[in-house]
Amino acid sequence: MSEKEIWEKVLKIAQEKLSAVSYSTFLKDTELYTIKDGEAIVLSSIPFNANWLNQQYAEIIQAILFDVVGYEVKPHFITTEELANYSNNETATPKETTKPSTETTEDNHVLGREQFNAHNTFDTFVIGPGNRFPHAASLAVAEAPAKAYNPLFIYGGVGLGKTHLMHAIGHHVLDNNPDAKVIYTSSEKFTNEFIKSIRDNEGEAFRERYRNIDVLLIDDIQFIQNKVQTQEEFFYTFNELHQNNKQIVISSDRPPKEIAQLEDRLRSRFEWGLIVDITPPDYETRMAILQKKIEEEKLDIPPEALNYIANQIQSNIRELEGALTRLLAYSQLLGKPITTELTAEALKDIIQAPKSKKITIQDIQKIVGQYYNVRIEDFSAKKRTKSIAYPRQIAMYLSRELTDFSLPKIGEEFGGRDHTTVIHAHEKISKDLKEDPIFKQEVENLEKEIRNV
């Protein structure tokens, strides 16, 4: 594949994974220049964007590149101005990109500091009420791996600092013991490497890589749900590490009990240690994050502009810092000083229609479960008692009405049920709604509550 073909595929996948605002602001207009020596050089026309992409999106792009090209490639975003200083004799003409040798691929399986964002340390982590406990637990684990909490399970929404804490643990462990073998990976990458090891008959090398280490940091574990072989492999990896007193840190967007299609034996192991959750930052924490950012970047931004951002962007840290980056780029491109008015103008696309949060099936299960006194895990169970089966059908109905997920995907989130079960549930609830006005009001109230999540 040429660079252009590779990057088109990367952008297509990234568009599905990132918010519309993040994608259009930072990634949409980038261009893959070359892939060389395990590094992808990607061009961005705006300096702030290149810096932001390197800090916040390098990991997700690296995982996507692995999916597209089938081997490890580390993305590096540079500006078109920096391209002149890029020391290679290549031209920008698209050419065929070839897979590196096995030696090169193995060399990219680093166990050291290269895996971690240099910025993501404990010193740069802004502590507030929503993350104080996860921060303390992470520091305890980093100070004494496998002696404090093992495993440490961190969960919370997107962009709240889970990955920052995992990188901080990695940095701190290596500061204390430079010879420690530390792996940071995502469950998606773990799955891809596992599949590749089966395909290439390299299962022993895969197991050696993941089991002969001191610390395993694995992000977004929820993505192994419904992957039976991957779960089995991770189960044995977990056991091997835990029995040998090696530290395991896991992150997810939800607690273990809410991960559908997760084997009970894995779920119980995730609950062996300490489970901590990160919640969205309050106003004071948001202001502290912005102030720390402008101090680090040596920027001059009026307090009233920061106040405007902190008041308007409340969902997560990534969007908060993204808004600041967008403002800086907007000011630079227009050649105007930053004021509250310019800030409002720069962020109007984000703030005006902040868009209702995208509804997830987990949101629906949580609210329906609370209303009918059904545990979230029961939606995925095989139980058919009416007290569980009927709320499950209501949740399936609402999942089809309020989300864009396919029938098979909805069935998967309800214990791997067939798409015909979802169709039947939708038809039954639709019929009951027409016949029972009280029930109709009940479901409408549930729908309103879900939309307001």
UniProtKB/Swiss-Prot annotation:
Disulfide bonds: none annotated. GO terms for molecular function: ATP binding; ATP hydrolysis activity; DNA replication origin binding; lipid binding. It is found in: Cytoplasm. Keywords: ATP-binding, Cytoplasm, DNA replication, DNA-binding, Lipid-binding, Nucleotide-binding. Residues 115-331 are annotated as: Domain III, AAA+ region. InterPro entries: AAA+_ATPase, Chromosome_initiator_DnaA, Chromosome_initiator_DnaA-like, Chromosome_initiator_DnaA_CS, DnaA_C, DnaA_dom, DnaA_N_dom, DnaA_N_sf. GO terms for biological process: DNA replication initiation; regulation of DNA replication. One of its GO terms (cellular component) is cytoplasm. Residues 71-114 are annotated as: Domain II. It holds the Pfam family DnaA_N. Oligomerizes as a right-handed, spiral filament on DNA at oriC. This is Chromosomal replication initiator protein DnaA. It comes from Staphylococcus aureus (strain bovine RF122 / ET3-1).
